[in-house]
């Protein structure tokens, strides 16, 4: 039981808590900064029941493994690689949000609005959905940092599947809004999510 209070677990759990706080607060602050406080709700914190359950299950895996297999959590290079993934994912996602500005929203827009524009510069030159790419890297990184093998695989599969379904839906409307301009962009730039065209 003392493994729960070891230096390793304190470091890993502290980094996880700080990563979660930074991610969610920064998403909310960016939404308010870009769209104005009157246009932003608490949903911009991006905390849903399913997300909270996934994080709770990952914590349960962590605690179970640190008690039963404490050596599993001692792989510092794996944990540090996960921390690097978190930082890289954050940078990509935040660069996407800042670059897109008012064209970025947490919800898929199904109606064209005057301020919408097709963003193809900055990080969008490299991929069509950098915010999804960043979140995928970030979410899997949280589990790699905790040395959670089951949750790392589960997060990768679930988040990838979510975006594999979301991207075609979102791109249907982007095609409606921007027509040939979007089709040409989509043909020349990868989605940013592996195996999703």
From Swiss-Prot:
Q: Keywords in UniProt for this one?
A: Endoplasmic reticulum, Membrane, Methyltransferase, S-adenosyl-L-methionine, Transferase, Transmembrane, Transmembrane helix
InterPro entries under this entry? ICMT_MeTrfase (IPR007269), PPMT_MeTrfase (IPR025770)
The induction comment states: Not induced by abscisic acid or auxin.
Name the residues that bind substrate.
166
- Ranges that cross the membrane: 16-36, 52-72, 81-101, 140-160
The consequence of residue 188 to R is: Activity increased to the level of that of ICMTB
Question: Which GO CC annotations does the UniProt entry carry?
Answer: endoplasmic reticulum; endoplasmic reticulum membrane
Q: Name one GO molecular function term.
A: carboxyl-O-methyltransferase activity
The cofactor(s) it depends on are: Zn(2+)
- Asked whether the keyword Transmembrane helix is assigned, the reply is yes
The record ties this protein, via Gene3D superfamilies, to: 1.20.120.1630
Keyword Endoplasmic reticulum listed: yes
* Record-listed S-adenosyl-L-methionine binding positions: 116-119, 124, 129-132, 170
Predominant location of this chain? Answer: endoplasmic reticulum
What is the activity-regulation note? Inhibited by farnesylthioacetic acid (FTAA) and N-acetyl-S-trans, trans-farnesyl-l-cysteine (AFC).
| Biological-process GO terms, alphabetical | C-terminal protein methylation; flower development; negative regulation of abscisic acid-activated signaling pathway; shoot system development
* UniProt similarity note: Belongs to the class VI-like SAM-binding methyltransferase superfamily. Isoprenylcysteine carboxyl methyltransferase family.
Q: Which protein, by its recorded name, is this?
A: Protein-S-isoprenylcysteine O-methyltransferase A
């Amino acid at each position: 039981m003392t493994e729960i209070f070891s230096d390793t677990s304190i470091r890993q759990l502290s980094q996880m808590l700080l990563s979660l706080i930074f991610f969610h607060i920064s998403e909310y602050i960016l939404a308010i900064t870009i769209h104005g406080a009157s246009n932003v709700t608490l949903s911009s914190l991006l905390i849903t029941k399913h997300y909270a359950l996934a994080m709770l299950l990952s914590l349960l895996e962590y605690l179970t493994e640190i008690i039963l297999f404490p050596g599993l959590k001692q792989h510092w290079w794996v944990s540090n690689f996960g921390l690097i993934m978190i930082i890289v994912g954050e940078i990509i996602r935040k660069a996407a949000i800042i670059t897109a500005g008012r064209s970025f929203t947490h919800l898929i827009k199904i109606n064209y609005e005057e301020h919408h524009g097709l963003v193809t510069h900055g990080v969008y030159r490299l991929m069509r959905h950098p915010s999804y790419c960043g979140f995928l890297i970030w979410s899997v990184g949280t589990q790699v940092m905790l040395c959670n093998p089951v949750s790392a695989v589960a997060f990768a599969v679930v988040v990838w599947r979510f975006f594999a379904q979301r991207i075609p839906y979102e791109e249907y409307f982007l095609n409606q809004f921007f027509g040939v301009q979007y089709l040409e962009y989509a043909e020349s730039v990868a989605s940013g999510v592996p195996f999703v065209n």
